[in-house]
Structures are given as structure tokens and as C-alpha cells.
Amino acid sequence: MIRIFIDADACPVRDETYRVAQRHGLQTFVVSNRMIAIPSSPLIERIVVTQGMDVADDWIAEQVNAHDIVISADIPLAARCVARGACVLDPRGRILDEDAIGMALAMRNLMEDLRATGAITQGGRGFTRADRSTFLSALDTAVVRGRKRAAQAR
């Protein structure tokens, strides 16, 4: 059975993920380093890790299995999860899989270097209603694909 892991500390699509998880009956882990409100559901479990750099990321990367779904904007975490066979979605609905993760890592590193040199001083664009809609569609697609792949792997 596929599961969903949310890198929850700064995730703008937690509520949308909860709804999709409930509709599909998927166990969901909401992982953060602080208390985050979650719906009362036997399918949704809050995991509060200790404070520290990448502690939540480490927990997710160690628990995730092939065919699971991870919601995160953290590209290095995404790379770790993809290496374990998981499907990763960022909050804007971009699917980060084996085909896309290399380019995503390269772009992240380039942008980090440009920010460090002062060539880029602005943040990214704001999160929109269209982003939310794209995410919902991508998550539904990821669930269907994950179930098919898990069934084929049996």
C-alpha cells in the first residue's frame, strides 16, 4: 500500500493533501519539527521530530519506500526519496522523478550560487490558486500511478 509523507513545516498544501489522502484511504505522515494541527483521522499521523537541520528530512528519507508519495519543496530531500523509488511532488504540482530530479538539483545549485553572489536578490513568485489546483491534479495522478506500479511489483 502506498503512503504519503508531507514535509510539513512550510508546506502550503497540507489541507489539500489531507483531502486526497482521505478520499483514497491512504496513510499519511505529517512530519515537522513543531506541532502542526492535523485533522482527526486514523489515516493521518503527526510526527514531530527534534529540532535540528534536516531532522525531518532524514526521518522521511529513512521511512519512505518505493511507490510512496512525498510532498516537499526540498530538492535534496526529493533526490533522496526518488533514489528509494518514491514519487515526489512539490507544492506547485511538479513531479520530481528519476527523469526530473537531476535537472532540479542542478537548477537549485545554480540559483543558490546566484543568490550567494548577489546576482539574484528577490525570492520566487507567490503561491497562487492555480498552483493549488495544479498540485491537486498532480497528486491524484501520482496516487493512481503509484497504485498501478505497486500492483505490478507484486
Swiss-Prot record:
Annotated transmembrane regions: none
Pfam families assigned to the protein according to its UniProt record, in alphabetical order: DUF188
Domain of life the protein comes from: Bacteria
PANTHER family tied to this protein: UPF0178 PROTEIN YAII (PTHR35146:SF1)
Stated family: Belongs to the UPF0178 family.
Protein name, per record: UPF0178 protein GDI0551/Gdia_1457
Source taxonomy: Bacteria, Pseudomonadati, Pseudomonadota, Alphaproteobacteria, Acetobacterales
